[in-house]
Design a protein with these regions (language model features):
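A generic, well-ordered mixed alpha/beta core segment in the N-terminal half of proteins
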Residues: 1-52, 59
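Glycine-rich anion-binding loops and their surrounding alpha/beta cores
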Residues: 16-17, 36-38, 48-231
Length: 231
């Protein structure tokens, strides 16, 4: 849709294993693994990330490639078996100047959602904030959460969470990197429908980025870009 995307996350070699007991991510599919299956290599440093971003418009940036100190603290989860405040801190960071990028940030626990919004307002970083799905910043495909827009000194509810009963559950992939990457490929080439909740999240990000002037324009752009969007 014409907007470059940087996804930062854990180093693939340092993903938590069985030692983690506190909200363990063991068994989850991590974004870096999915992108690896899609043939998108992780950047080794910021210079390489910039090159890959120009070439393909999307890049995965491991934490050690731009915040090695925080990466070492993050890796302690494996030995200690608990999370630290680094997890929350990382949600607000990105490798750009404050006004050069927008942030898509999500938290698992409701009390942190307000704190996250306060952080983005204080730092004047434009951001979309919402409840996470398995710790990841994408809208739950089964039911869209509240989407809050932090921009120009205010935080507002852009789209309220979906309370409607589901007529049927969205067709989603198994909890495997290979099947998830195949699902993404199928959505991109029109063999499967883009889940509506994710389409609405994307529309909100297109609005926040300035790519589209309003939600109606963003939704129209998505309909041009994806041949199938779930109802």
């Amino acid at each position: 849709c014409g907007v470059s995307v940087v996804i930062h996350g854990a180093d693939l070699d340092d993903l938590p294993g069985s030692a983690c007991a506190d909200h363990s991510p063991q068994g989850r599919v991590h974004t870096g693994q999915i992108l690896e299956h899609l043939g998108l290599a992780a950047a080794a440093n910021l210079a390489q990330a910039e090159t890959l971003l120009q070439l393909q418009g999307l890049v995965y940036l491991p934490l050690s490639a731009w915040q090695p100190g925080l990466a070492r603290i993050f890796a302690l989860r494996e030995s200690l078996g608990i999370r630290s405040s680094v997890h929350t801190l990382l949600k607000g960071l990105h490798p750009f100047a404050p006004q050069e990028a927008i942030v898509c940030a999500a938290v698992t626990h409701p009390p942190y959602l307000q704190r996250l919004q306060e952080f983005f307002l204080a730092t004047e970083i434009p951001a979309l904030c919402f409840r996470a799905t398995e710790g990841e910043p994408f809208a739950n495909p089964q039911r869209r959460p509240d989407l809050f827009l932090c921009h120009q000194g205010e935080s507002r509810l852009l789209l309220a969470k979906d309370h409607a009963s589901l007529a049927q559950l969205p067709e989603l992939p198994d909890n495997l990197a290979a099947s998830t990457s195949e699902f993404i490929s199928a959505v991109l080439d029109g063999r499967r429908a883009l889940p509506l909740a994710i389409a609405e999240q994307t529309a909100a990000l297109l609005l926040l980025s300035g790519r589209c002037a309003d939600l109606a324009t963003a939704r129209a752009l998505l309909r041009q870009s994806f041949t199938r969007i779930a109802a």
